[in-house]
């Protein structure tokens, strides 16, 4: 496989499978507040098993993931965390190197979340421009990878709406519409949402489960017992556990 600095890449792996692209989106837990100082020496090295969209470089090329260097950038609300923190991408790289996804390496990754965000702020007409960025970033991957892509979206969203008091029926409907836009932008995408049992928010969890029951290609993972770094965020170990649960739900049997 050859990755080029511009243009497109020859991306058909030796196993003949489509390039596998992960998109991590939502609020601050999609960016992540796992301490890099807790990571292993291997986890702190450049990880060629995961090629992440470099949001700060011209053309947003795909480059090897490295915690503290390119894993957490252009994420509203986490600007002071860029060099010292990470999210779900760390365990994704572990899975690509020696775990359940080792036969799909390299994986491709787009991070496009924003801290403090509510579902209304992800509407295409919202002044935040969050949806426009989602489209721009995923389009940048499409331009660099030839052929049909396999998309998996991990979404962690709902805490800020619960805190803000967004009416649950309204929230559920708006999230359903948002998921529809995601699946239109990313054909065939499978979406896995995080629930928030480890933080609380029982009504939000119930609505997420209902979305997973009602919508095609949408799943959710419960997070009971997952350790936190504070009241609303998973830390180093918690992010590993959540990522492992997300991976288990990301693929149908036989894939």
Where are these regions (language model features)?
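Cell-envelope and extracellular/periplasmic
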Residues: 3-255
């Amino acid at each position: 496989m050859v990755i080029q600095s511009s243009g497109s890449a020859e991306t058909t792996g030796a196993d003949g499978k489509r390039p596998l692209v992960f998109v991590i989106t939502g609020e601050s837990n999609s960016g992540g507040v796992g301490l890099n100082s807790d990571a292993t020496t291997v986890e702190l090295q450049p990880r060629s098993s995961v090629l992440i969209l470099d949001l700060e470089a011209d053309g947003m090329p795909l480059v090897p993931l490295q915690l503290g260097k390119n894993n957490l950038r252009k994420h509203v609300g986490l600007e002071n965390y860029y060099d010292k923190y990470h999210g779900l991408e760390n365990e994704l790289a572990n899975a690509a190197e020696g775990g359940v996804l080792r036969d799909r390496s390299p994986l491709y990754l787009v991070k496009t979340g924003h801290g403090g965000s509510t579902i209304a702020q992800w509407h295409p007409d919202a002044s935040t421009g969050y949806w426009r960025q989602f489209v721009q970033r995923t389009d940048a991957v499409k331009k660099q990878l030839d052929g049909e892509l396999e998309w998996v979206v991990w979404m962690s969203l709902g805490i800020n709406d619960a805190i803000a008091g967004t009416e649950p029926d309204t929230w559920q409907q708006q999230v359903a519409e948002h998921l529809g836009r995601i699946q239109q932008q990313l054909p065939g995408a499978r979406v896995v949402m995080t629930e928030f049992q480890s933080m609380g928010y029982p009504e939000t969890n119930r609505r997420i489960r209902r979305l997973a029951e009602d919508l095609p290609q949408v799943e959710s993972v419960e997070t009971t017992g997952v350790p936190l770094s504070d009241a609303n965020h998973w830390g180093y170990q918690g992010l590993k556990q959540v990522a492992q649960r997300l991976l288990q739900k990301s693929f149908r049997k036989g894939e």
